[in-house]
Design a protein with these regions (language model features):
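Extracytoplasmic catalytic/substrate-binding loops of multi-pass membrane glycan-assembly enzymes
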Residues: 61-75, 84-99, 106-109, 214, ...
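Membrane-embedded, lumen/periplasm-facing catalytic core of multi-pass transferases
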Residues: 410-471
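Perimembrane helix-loop-helix junctions
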Residues: 29-31, 181-182, 219-249, 253
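Hydrophobic/aromatic-rich transmembrane helices and adjacent perimembrane loops
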Residues: 77, 155-156, 162-170, 210-213, ...
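Membrane-lumen/periplasm interface segments of specific transmembrane helices
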Residues: 234-314, 320-329, 414-422
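Signature aromatic-anchored transmembrane alpha helix within multi-pass, membrane-resident enzymes
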Residues: 41-44, 137, 196-205, 242-245, ...
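Transmembrane-helix motifs of polytopic, lipid-linked glycan transferases
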Residues: 113-135, 170-175, 332-339
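Hydrophobic, aromatic-rich transmembrane alpha-helices
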Residues: 123-126, 305-350, 356-358
Length: 564
């Protein structure tokens, strides 16, 4: 590390010895940084304990109604019991989860503790990554944010990929920062690699693992390359690309040889206009531009502020999207990125990496998706860049420092308060679920659907195929019975084409639930794709459909046998 780099880090951390500054009065931020530096281990372990405590208090022992979290469990189970490699949507997380499926089976609560462990690791490695590289006030603001924010903590008890990805991403940043620390511009191309070959090997391995854990992970290494391009470290660009490609090639060779070629085309699915309707075609260039800016408006003007602002409501409407706010926020981030370029290379790296990550999200996700979980992997870095930028702006003005710290403290207390309220609301459901009532907390429509899935597993032969609106959820609550999925329906279904399609899939039974379109309210509007398909069959061939079982009276779920 050069003398200039060491001086920059020392200045950035603001941890100068007070005795060396007797002639200079310490500011509020100086005093806070000095106190945090002296007590950083105590502060960190306290925050780590509280983070883990909130992970447990906010623990959600149910699967979500989205279905993706159940799908990851099903893929992990299929890998263990059927040797089917989980290529679709990234194999990294199902492969890691498969170790726990091997030990605990389909025990959802046990499997969710893997995410709790990932949250623990994410907080720990984030601290190690940024410690002594950024001001302590900024460091502990970041650790507090990822420890208490209820959106981030939500994924600490879900079998979505987010907590796992955040953990891996923190390791990737840690390795990259170690490489940045060790850069020696005077070394030759070969010598430079030899001096840090261990770090570069770990870099290649970790970034490939990140890339196979979430499709968007491929752009992460692009962020690293972009940073080295801006800082004119061209040899590091060569090392980064070669190491990533080498490990990616090795991964491809091993998986293809052991499990066969990947038949799921992630790029093709990414280009679809509608993810689950391939017949809708693919986006052209102008369509991709529209997608980018639609997602840009949605995620920056809506979801970022929902996640950052602890008093923002969880529910939202399309009218909450404010495009001008997205552009204002982007300008602010750009200004803070420019500031960090001159002040702190690790914040600057975070900004460049963030640009690459968000760019990939905005281009790679269909605009109608609108899920906040897609931006959650970028939120720690968004918070970091924003908080650091404000820190730099106020540090020369004592009055503004006081206002800044007061505002940050209030926001922290409100964030903790919001998570505490949610923990109290969660207490009854958590107690019931841990006590064995696996359906408590679901609305009647979902409870009846899941009970019907279990009935199918308990009462029907294993060889009989059952059609389900949410096959992965049926799989979990049906004790591992495989179900056939029906996510959409033809535009104008007719009896003969429906029967022909079901017969090709050997569908013998159909679960007909009344799942709400509005999860919060039973207003009579339901997700009716299976209803639209079974109705013409019933009208034309009434003798080919037989009611087998009904569960529930309100928002009931029915099971029909199809007689070909």
């Amino acid at each position: 590390m050069s003398k200039k780099d060491k001086a920059q880090i020392k200045s950035s951390v603001s941890s100068k010895n007070p005795t060396a500054r007797t002639a200079v009065q310490l500011t509020l931020l100086d005093r806070l940084n000095n106190w945090f530096e002296k007590n950083d281990k105590k502060v960190f372990y306290t925050l780590l304990f509280l983070s883990t405590l909130f992970s447990l208090l906010l623990f959600d022992s149910k699967v979500s109604d989205g279905g993706d979290d159940s799908s990851y469990i099903e893929r992990a189970w299929s890998f263990i019991h059927e040797g089917k490699f989980p290529y679709f949507q990234g194999p990294g997380y199902p492969l890691a989860l498969s170790f726990f499926v091997k030990m605990f089976g389909l025990n959802v609560i046990a499997l969710k503790f893997f995410s709790v462990a990932c949250q623990f690791g994410f907080v720990w490695v984030t601290y190690l990554t940024f410690r002594k590289r950024i001001p302590y006030v900024v460091l502990f603001a970041l650790i507090s944010f990822i420890s208490f924010n209820n959106f981030i903590q939500y994924y600490a008890s879900q079998t979505f990929t987010e907590s796992f990805f955040l953990f891996l991403q923190s390791i990737c940043l840690y390795v990259t920062f170690k490489i940045i620390d060790a850069i020696n511009n005077d070394s030759s191309l070969i010598k430079g690699f030899q001096e840090n070959y261990g770090k570069w090997l770990l870099f290649g391995f970790m970034f490939v693992l990140l890339a196979i854990s979430k499709s968007i992970g491929f752009v992460a290494v692009g962020g690293v390359v972009l940073y080295f391009l801006f800082t004119r470290n061209y040899k590091q660009i060569v090392y980064a690309i070669l190491m990533f490609l080498a490990f990616r090639f090795l991964y491809q060779i091993i998986t293809t040889a052991e499990f066969g070629a990947n038949t799921s085309n992630q790029l093709e699915m990414m280009l679809r206009k509608q993810l689950y309707k391939p017949q809708g075609g693919h986006e052209d260039f102008s369509g991709m531009i529209d997608r980018f800016f639609n997602n840009f408006d949605t995620y920056i003007s809506l979801h970022i502020y929902r996640i950052l602002n602890p008093v923002y409501k969880h529910d939202y409407a399309i009218t909450d999207i404010v495009p001008p706010l997205a552009y204002i926020t982007t300008v602010v981030l750009a200004v803070f990125t420019f500031l960090s370029y001159k002040k702190n290379k690790f914040i600057f790296f975070s900004s460049i990496y963030l640009i690459s990550l968000c760019g990939g999200i905005f281009l790679g996700v269909q605009a109608q998706n609108m899920q906040d979980r897609l931006i959650i992997i970028a939120m720690p870095l968004i918070f970091l860049v924003l908080f650091y930028g404000m820190y730099e702006l106020v540090k020369k003005y004592s009055m503004l420092q006081t206002v800044f710290i007061l505002f940050a403290s209030i926001m922290l207390l409100v964030t903790i308060g919001k998570s505490t309220v949610l923990a109290k609301q969660n207490a009854t459901a958590l107690k019931k679920n841990l006590g064995g009532d696996v359906y408590y907390g679901f609305t009647p429509d979902w409870e009846n659907f899941l009970k019907m899935s279990k009935y199918c597993a308990d009462s029907l032969p294993d060889s009989e195929n059952v059609l389900s609106r949410k096959p992965s959820m049926s799989f979990i609550y049906g004790n591992g019975k495989k179900f056939i999925g029906q996510w959409d329906s033809p535009e104008n279904p007719n009896a003969d084409s429906v029967l022909m399609g079901w017969q090709k899939q050997n569908v013998k039974y159909v679960i007909l639930p009344n799942l709400r379109m509005n999860p919060k309210k039973n207003n009579g509007k339901i997700i009716n794709n299976i209803h639209r398909m079974i109705l013409p069959v019933y009208q034309k061939y009434r003798d080919k459909i037989r009611l087998v079982k009904t569960i529930g009276t309100i928002e009931k779920c029915e099971l029909y046998e199809i007689i070909y």
